[in-house]
Amino acid sequence: MRFLLAAALAASTIASPLTAQAAPPDLSTSMPLPGRWSWTPTVDGSEATYFDTAGRAQLWLHCLRGARTVTIARPASGAAPFLMVWSSSASRNLLASFNPATAHLTAQLTAADPLLDALAFSRGRIGAGISGTAPLVAPAWPEIARVVEDCRA
């Protein structure tokens, strides 16, 4: 019985190359990019946007209420397979797509995804990263939770 339990635990910790995740940065020591969050109602839901001090949008969470999905996006210079998203309690590499017209890397989650709760209730900071670039760390403000709740209503 102990052998089966040990074998099961060992097998569960082996990650395939498709699911391997880079370790997220330590949010407790990462300084957030100076800026501010803004919440805006949209025709199809709502959106929270994080602007740097120059007024450039750096991170978006957009609710499509009819589809019950939340799209997370950040500027990117090219395509990447994953958008790494993390909070103080959870992290995940999300399959991403690149839109060359807007130069954004986007990932989509269902409104019920627990990662959205982790972002909404993160202790102080959240992050979004693209392999080969510096991670974007932003403060966790109420605008994030508002978008999540709008999508679940």
Task: Kindly give the residue locations of the regions a language model identified.
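Positively charged n-region of N-terminal signal peptides that target proteins for export
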Residues: 1-4
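Sterically constrained small-residue positions within well-ordered secondary structures
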Residues: 11-13, 52, 63, 98, ...
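N-terminal secretory signal peptides
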Residues: 20-81
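Internal interaction segment
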Residues: 21-22, 91-153
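Short polybasic amphipathic segments
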Residues: 48-49, 82-84, 125-128
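Extended low-complexity, serine/threonine- and proline-enriched intrinsically disordered segments
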Residues: 80-92
